[in-house]
Amino acid sequence: MDTELLKTFLEVSRTRHFGRAAESLYLTQSAVSFRIRQLENQLGVNLFTRHRNNIRLTAAGEKLLPYAETLMSTWQAARKEVAHTSRHNEFSIGASASLWECMLNQWLGRLYQNQDTHTGLQFEARIAQRQSLVKQLHERQLDLLITTEAPKMDEFSSQLLGYFTLALYTSAPSKLKGDLNYLRLEWGPDFQQHEAGLIGTDEVPILTTSSAELAQQQIAMLNGCTWLPVSWARKKGGLHTVVDSTTLSRPLYAIWLQNSDKHALIRDLLKINVLDEVY
């Protein structure tokens, strides 16, 4: 039996709501409904009664509940034990492509230079969208997440690492926003709220990407502009701030599970500055 089906069953039984269960599992509501139907088909019984917003366990669902809890608990314990034996020297760090390119790449180098304390530690640099990385963190498939947004779940611990400055850059001097095409570099969902006020409300990006390197290479060819970290852009060279634009300060957070067995290691690693310029 697919353990994901049992996991979904337990979440729906806990929340009594398909929408809230979907949100907790980082799935769509239709995916949750499909999983429940799959489980019901495998067992040959209905597990829930559905009357609008009133979702209840059937008698069969009530009988399945303790077995599902035991199976999932055993499975999680097995996964943790196996992972501990195979990954005791591995440490995975997740972030978006733009964060790796603009600041975390340098930090990773500093971690290797300071390996005296943790000799033999093997790092994995994982690139993905924030939502995917949060899910991996929740499922203990990721040790540490670096992101521009504070955690929204109580089970996570976090540390504010500092702030970095974004400015609107183009490839030629003395350019105005109205003369340029906008390239959207993704800096997190909450950044889009600020972005709307800093770029014209009717401005449609001709390119959207999560890679700062790609965006930087395209602005000259597309007569464009994009938001880049000031410290990174200065090192790159050949970039100029748009005349009628402003700057924006962004926070950077480290996030990990509160009950992580690598809590002490994480604290040690974060003593090494993540940002070149911390303020």
From Swiss-Prot:
Keywords (A to Z) from UniProt: DNA-binding, Repressor, Transcription, Transcription regulation
Residues within the DNA-binding region(s): 18-37
GO molecular function: DNA binding; DNA-binding transcription factor activity
Keyword tRNA-binding: no
Pfam families recorded: HTH_1, LysR_substrate
Occurrences of domain HTH lysR-type (ranges): 1-58
Keyword rRNA processing recorded: no
Coiled coil start-end: none
PROSITE patterns reported in the protein's UniProt record: HTH_LYSR
GO BP annotations listed: negative regulation of DNA-templated transcription
Top-level taxon in the UniProt lineage: Bacteria
Xref: PANTHER family: HTH-TYPE TRANSCRIPTIONAL REGULATOR HDFR, TRANSCRIPTIONAL REGULATOR
NCBIfam families xref list: PRK03601.1
Family stated for the protein in its record: Belongs to the LysR transcriptional regulatory family.
Function per UniProt: Negatively regulates the transcription of the flagellar master operon flhDC by binding to the upstream region of the operon.
Entry protein name: HTH-type transcriptional regulator HdfR
Annotated source species: Escherichia fergusonii (strain ATCC 35469 / DSM 13698 / CCUG 18766 / IAM 14443 / JCM 21226 / LMG 7866 / NBRC 102419 / NCTC 12128 / CDC 0568-73)
Gene name for this UniProt entry: hdfR
